[in-house]
Amino acid sequence: MKPLAIPANHGVMGQQEKHSLPADFTKLHLTDSLHPQVTHVSSSHSGCSITSDSGSSSLSDIYQATESEAGDMDLSGLPETAVDSEDDDDEEDIERASDPLMSRDIVRDCLEKDPIDRTDDDIEQLLEFMHQLPAFANMTMSVRRELCAVMVFAVVERAGTIVLNDGEELDSWSVILNGSVEVTYPDGKAEILCMGNSFGVSPTMDKEYMKGVMRTKVDDCQFVCIAQQDYCRILNQVEKNMQKVEEEGEIVMVKEHRELDRTGTRKGHIVIKGTSERLTMHLVEEHSVVDPTFIEDFLLTYRTFLSSPMEVGKKLLEWFNDPSLRDKVTRVVLLWVNNHFNDFEGDPAMTRFLEEFENNLEREKMGGHLRLLNIACAAKAKRRLMTLTKPSREAPLPFILLGGSEKGFGIFVDSVDSGSKATEAGLKRGDQILEVNGQNFENIQLSKAMEILRNNTHLSITVKTNLFVFKELLTRLSEEKRNGAPHLPKIGDIKKASRYSIPDLAVDVEQVIGLEKVNKKSKANTVGGRNKLKKILDKTRISILPQKPYNDIGIGQSQDDSIVGLRQTKHIPTALPVSGTLSSSNPDLLQSHHRILDFSATPDLPDQVLRVFKADQQSRYIMISKDTTAKEVVIQAIREFAVTATPDQYSLCEVSVTPEGVIKQRRLPDQLSKLADRIQLSGRYYLKNNMETETLCSDEDAQELLRESQISLLQLSTVEVATQLSMRNFELFRNIEPTEYIDDLFKLRSKTSCANLKRFEEVINQETFWVASEILRETNQLKRMKIIKHFIKIALHCRECKNFNSMFAIISGLNLAPVARLRTTWEKLPNKYEKLFQDLQDLFDPSRNMAKYRNVLNSQNLQPPIIPLFPVIKKDLTFLHEGNDSKVDGLVNFEKLRMIAKEIRHVGRMASVNMDPALMFRTRKKKWRSLGSLSQGSTNATVLDVAQTGGHKKRVRRSSFLNAKKLYEDAQMARKVKQYLSNLELEMDEESLQTLSLQCEPATNTLPKNPGDKKPVKSETSPVAPRAGSQQKAQSLPQPQQQPPPAHKINQGLQVPAVSLYPSRKKVPVKDLPPFGINSPQALKKILSLSEEGSLERHKKQAEDTISNASSQLSSPPTSPQSSPRKGYTLAPSGTVDNFSDSGHSEISSRSSIVSNSSFDSVPVSLHDERRQRHSVSIVETNLGMGRMERRTMIEPDQYSLGSYAPMSEGRGLYATATVISSPSTEELSQDQGDRASLDAADSGRGSWTSCSSGSHDNIQTIQHQRSWETLPFGHTHFDYSGDPAGLWASSSHMDQIMFSDHSTKYNRQNQSRESLEQAQSRASWASSTGYWGEDSEGDTGTIKRRGGKDVSIEAESSSLTSVTTEETKPVPMPAHIAVASSTTKGLIARKEGRYREPPPTPPGYIGIPITDFPEGHSHPARKPPDYNVALQRSRMVARSSDTAGPSSVQQPHGHPTSSRPVNKPQWHKPNESDPRLAPYQSQGFSTEEDEDEQVSAV
């Protein structure tokens, strides 16, 4: 077995001279691709290219292309009010947000090309897709590349098609891309092969023969085939490309020769595997152009095969003494410090290594390198919090301080007493003190700092290592000693040397060393980021100091993440401004970066607002900056209130009210800063006269404050909630160290124990249950609906913020069983939001490895920051880890490690930002408010105006002055959201949620109050074996007095044994797998011919609009919907339920059609047998029109277009003889759903969008058993016609009215089986890589695996639903509004049944003939579908008939039906509320079921 390989990553480092130090930081950014300056574009056309390093796109390119307008979501019309009311929404903008995704299938396009026509790009596309499949595991990248170049694509349309016969000669090696096949051996054993499995010849030219018979299990099976000759040549050629490095007769390293393109310019040897010692040595060897990221990959992954980093450290120190290796060693250490500084922090041995290395650099006079090392250390160092206590105020401090704002520096620790508590706490020389007891020390005089430290016995100190600035401070002090006077730079020099061009600046950091200070007012502005206010100020004020680039000090992430090629920002443009006034032994090294680490060199910019009260409750709004102190606020407040006293007579007080109503008042220290962040919602700032003891806040005011601090979700701005969620998620996401992914994946022990990763992992569960808790705790139904609407809007805005994690969590919360079952609540939701919710769900369609989501994520303009869906990240990493061996032939499989490292770099790049997290998500809010707050500002404001408005011309004229009140209100809303989110009480127990759900809407509420109110009626036939209790109920059901012949046939059909839906999913070794043969007319054309056969018929059928039902039912199925024409509504093949993806795209991998997951193995023999089998196994084996209708209704749920009747006509006869089959879930059908039937489940992702399995197994539970009875609730036994041929149109119309239950699958979230997929998903952590995401990996399409040792049971947990009439009852007029009521309290109820229009009545003059009335294979002359326009016109003119039309069967009170007349014409039945036919069902509560002998378990 050969180790995996990946396309080589071309970083800048790979092109530079290896022996020279990079001249600037651009060379230190080892990036996979260079990112341009972040420009903000609408999210539909945006997308950071999170693609592979070789330029290939990821698997998501299956649905490659743009999202059309889907993500534009120009919600500028949503005003920011306390509550976003329904009426305030801009209809146009919301609707634009809900446009469907339009994508094309690039991988399919590449596969369908002739192999000789494939370009390098095509091969890269295929390579990226194929590497996910198990069949290609442990192959080197060059082998995969060659296989992709010669593979041929084949499609087998129909389930049950024999692909290979026993004893047939094999001619190819094949891999299943979609669907599954079953191999039946002569001894009767059977084996299932799924997506990603391979079969066929072994890599020899010997003749091999098929063992057993291979049949397709599902429709639309897709394969790639490689001819035996090519397969043999490619795999045997591998050895020729290998270069083995031997030492003392043992192989210590294996390299592979690789060509990355056909030009021959990118070729060389790349390390495949080696011993740990040899891999370490390779760090300082020459690296080829095809292996530019070896050092980065090694430094990230060495921990998987080395016990200690010092093994590498010792070697590096040793090699440093070799002058020829010195530069390379320095480069490795710089990269190590920059990329993984956490390896050094907290590890004494590594800290000593770093100090020793610094000493070596000093010794060798490598000042430039040393400076870079110090910059990297300072940039990557994390803030540390330590607590010191002194016995008394007079006790001396155990450390000596230097610096101070008077020197233009912060406060630094010069020395620490050895053995003191400060040393034990981790304080060391070179630490900068950032904060003490909440007071900012970044811009404070040394004397003031010493005073604060001395006057407190309890010290909570925040420090950060900043050796770079500390050494500059020492240099300055030594210069002053020599020169005798402090150096004060001229103002002109500062301005000249510090011009910044913000758009060219791509680092999210502050200017480096602020040596120049004009006065103490030039404070360290740590709020970060430019904004609109800044732009306004710049017009009216001369900036003495340079404008500050984006930074993020004080937001929880130090300004470290983009200085020397950090993990997030992978690129610093060469166009960085020069601002160097610093003397240096090697100034050119720092010409564009020596300002990066200054914490105290920016002007004081007011971008926050405080509301300050006086004792008489007057208030003023005061503009401040983050570092404005309480003393300065007092001065401003005195001026604003026009008080004549001196500032010394007043102080700033904070008055707060506890939840118990206790008023607290405290005077704030004069030097306290960050005032806007400290104020609580239940607090106010007061200007207090020190000489008076007045009451600042009365009891009435306190009560008002208390009321204001009590927040409900509906009071909060959806935009602000989404913004705060995104900021919180992003903080967690960006703080994850790359090494944490490795530690978690390989289960390594680490100092941090992956704390950041675990926190981010937990967020998705917390947010999911937050949604459910918030909805279910609301007792008022209307408010519940509004909360659901609120969450949909929040999810929409999360998408704007590219926060896919929260968006997914919210959608998951809305789909949790206890929420989804609230039918009456969902019914009240406006159509617009229903559609929005549907579109949001669409994005996370799990089919084909989350292809739609990946496509959006990889779209070309999506720029960071991006918060990806974490479970997908974890699943991908787990697949790479578990799908490939860590050691091959006793050597470390470095190819596997390289692939994992590349994936982690891709994830890290999503967090690469160059602005403050507090601002980055606000820039996506477009023009939400008429006057944006500063916190929404951006230097790219002009770009935003153009790019984010989606072409809308309407603009709100911005005020040219600052509206402090508006800014305060915006900030107050942000505070409310923060407080709300911080005080959430989550209900994480699903049982408790279910209880709350039942309290909101008791199970009895799902029963119809009367027959005519559009509520469903229950059916009695169940496709599953009921539990014991249900069986007893079924036996007690009153039996019909006589049985029509069709029922007898059905009864015979019931004797057909049930077929297991749960074949084994065990993986089979490739060598044991049966393969394609060559007994076809042309070698290698076996499957292709099968594919072409269907293709011809498809084209024929597409031309025949008037095809007969009989012929269509018995004819060969069309080719797959993936084949062109892509969007044709071709007939679904026999045995399908739906073969169409929901957007008209083709699907290649991971997901076959619904029937691919649900078809049974038995092959229909005759029409009657087929019909019997259908009933016995509860599957629609032959509903030809179904696919089209599901397809149509899925795409346009609001428009069950009249055009749908035309394609439907081809399959009508089928429905006339269909049988009634019920669902195991508490589905409901409604009377007026026909026109707008939304059959979202037609593609596997829609039916079960939370399923990660490519096979979407829950569709077997939802679609197969829900859809089967929904599509067949009207047979000849259901209608009032039996003698004359009843109108096909009538049955079709009945089908329209009855057949579909809107959202039946989408919201049918809880198939009663506790072990069902939905239950497993909602209970398990979404982030579980081996459970929810890992188990359902790509390799097992079309089968259902065992979970937790039990088969996923389709059997209902409490009881199965039953149909109103069975084949054994006499024909009873079936009310059009068949309803299904739940006898279980936990079932999910499909919602919105009562909303849709009824379909038009049966057009007069058309008759339908049951398909059983004429022999198979012959079309009936009278079965020509009506002309569409005529039928439509007539249907509009004819009034509906009610129960008055002719006598009807009357249901006896005890449920014994009698037939009162033969049925001559199809009639629409709209019974009165007191319709006697429904009485028995009302009285019985619809809890009865058929006899158990009628029940055939589908399991």
Curated annotation (Swiss-Prot):
Binding sites annotated in the UniProt record for a nucleoside 3',5'-cyclic phosphate: 135-254
Region of interest (Disordered), ranges: 40-59, 68-101, 1002-1050, 1095-1160, 1224-1256, 1305-1499
Positions of the PDZ domain: 385-470
One Pfam family per UniProt: PDZ
Domain Ras-associating: 606-692
Compositional bias annotation for Low complexity: 1031-1040, 1111-1125, 1141-1160, 1355-1366
UniProt PTM comment: Ubiquitinated by NEDD4, leading to proteasomal degradation. Phosphorylation by PLK2 promotes its activity.
Annotated InterPro entries: cNMP-bd_dom, cNMP-bd_dom_sf, PDZ, PDZ_sf, RA_dom, Ras-like_Gua-exchang_fac_N, Ras_GEF_dom_sf, RASGEF_cat_dom
Domain N-terminal Ras-GEF per the UniProt entry, residue ranges: 267-380
Annotated phenotype, changing residue 1428 to A: Abolishes interaction with NEDD4 and NEDD4-induced ubiquitination and degradation
CDD domains documented for this protein: CAP_ED, PDZ_RapGEF2_RapGEF6-like, RA_PDZ-GEF1, RasGEF, REM
UniProt-reported outcome of changing residue 898 to D: Does not inhibit interaction with NEDD4. Does not interact with HRAS. Reduces ubiquitination
Limits of the Ras-GEF domain: 717-944
Keywords: Cell junction, Cell membrane, Cytoplasm, Developmental protein, Differentiation, Endosome, Epilepsy, GTPase activation, Guanine-nucleotide releasing factor, Membrane, Neurogenesis, Phosphoprotein, Ubl conjugation
GO cellular component annotations of the record: apical plasma membrane; bicellular tight junction; cell-cell junction; cytoplasm; cytosol; endocytic vesicle; late endosome; membrane
Entry-annotated residues carrying Phosphothreonine: 644
Gene3D superfamilies xrefs: 2.30.42.10, Jelly Rolls, Phosphatidylinositol 3-kinase Catalytic Subunit, Chain A, domain 1, Ras guanine-nucleotide exchange factors catalytic domain, Son of sevenless (SoS) protein Chain: S domain 1
Bias type Polar residues, positions: 1247-1256, 1307-1331, 1441-1462
Modified residues (Phosphoserine): 501, 806, 930, 933, 1022, 1080, 1089, 1095, 1116, 1120, 1159, 1176
Subcellular location: Cytoplasm; Cytoplasm, Perinuclear region; Cell membrane; Late endosome
Keyword Ribonucleoprotein attributed: no
PANTHER family assigned to the protein according to its UniProt record, in alphabetical order: CYTOSKELETON-ASSOCIATED PROTEIN 4, RAP GUANINE NUCLEOTIDE EXCHANGE FACTOR 2
Primary role: Functions as a guanine nucleotide exchange factor (GEF), which activates Rap and Ras family of small GTPases by exchanging bound GDP for free GTP in a cAMP-dependent manner. Serves as a link between cell surface receptors and Rap/Ras GTPases in intracellular signaling cascades. Also acts as an effector for Rap1 by direct association with Rap1-GTP thereby leading to the amplification of Rap1-mediated signaling. Shows weak activity on HRAS. It is controversial whether RAPGEF2 binds cAMP and cGMP or not.
Domain commentary: The Ras-associating domain is necessary for the Rap guanine nucleotide exchange activity. The N-terminal regionis necessary for cAMP-binding. The PDZ domain is necessary for its targeting to the cell membrane.
Involvement in disorder: Epilepsy, familial adult myoclonic, 7: A form of familial myoclonic epilepsy, a neurologic disorder characterized by cortical hand tremors, myoclonic jerks and occasional generalized or focal seizures with a non-progressive or very slowly progressive disease course. Usually, myoclonic tremor is the presenting symptom, characterized by tremulous finger movements and myoclonic jerks of the limbs increased by action and posture. In a minority of patients, seizures are the presenting symptom. Some patients exhibit mild cognitive impairment. FAME7 inheritance is autosomal dominant.
Protein name in the entry: Rap guanine nucleotide exchange factor 2
Higher taxonomy: Eukaryota, Metazoa, Chordata, Craniata, Vertebrata
Name of the encoding gene: RAPGEF2
